[in-house]
């Protein structure tokens, strides 16, 4: 008599097949493989794909090759304006600290003589996170919330933060040159920079900017008509907003990929920063004697 055939799936040699294990977790058996590379993957490593499952490494490699969406100004498209929220939080923290330690305003507010003669350069930026009262805080905070939400989405996180910092520094720079003996606090320089930038970028997008223009004119009127307001910080910030906003919105001319656009924006923002540094360091020697301040 002949021998019956072996059961289906059994080895003729009597050996049991070696079970496959996940390539990332050697202690986990699996019967599923990545449909892209063929490596075995356990349930924790399975990423659902249009056909079957992919492993984490193939998914990561695919994400690196996908072009990220960008705005018309070259910034990455964002979901949340995290920089705006962070700045609002820092401004709020600064105000709370002022209530606990009132001497903070004198120690960290903008004072041109203290900056240039005393070497307290940190005042150029720390002054932007301090305020003269609750209404001052609420106005600047509300303006930052509205303008920041729009600008950060248009420009992206990096460009928006650059605009804010250069606006604050420009307001402090003009205060140092024209009113070095005056102590000033507030984010108004940076806020006026946002006004200038939102006008330029909004026009570039073809939006109706008449309401922004009206608000800007009203605030400029308040700047010069209401006493004890640092017009130097407002004007310095506004100039920065128009200049930096124009860099981001109008340059480079013509069509450009995001790498070339980013390079141009970085170089132009760096050039503006260098100009600002020259004014801060060398400006007082020329301006203060002309104004009779020394």
Predicted regions located by residue number:
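Aromatic-anchored segments of alpha-helical transmembrane domains
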Residues: 96, 169-173, 217-226, 274-279
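Hydrophobic alpha-helical transmembrane segments of polytopic
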Residues: 83-91, 164, 211, 215, ...
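Membrane-helix interface "capping/anchor" motifs
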Residues: 152-159, 200-210
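N-terminal TM1-TM2 helical hairpin plus the immediately adjacent luminal interfacial "cap"
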Residues: 73, 79-187, 227-229
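Membrane-embedded alpha-helical segments of multi-pass transporters/permeases
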Residues: 173-177, 206, 242, 246
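Residue-level signature of the transmembrane alpha-helical core
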Residues: 92, 125, 165-169, 190, ...
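C-terminal transmembrane module of polytopic alpha-helical membrane proteins
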Residues: 1-76, 224-294
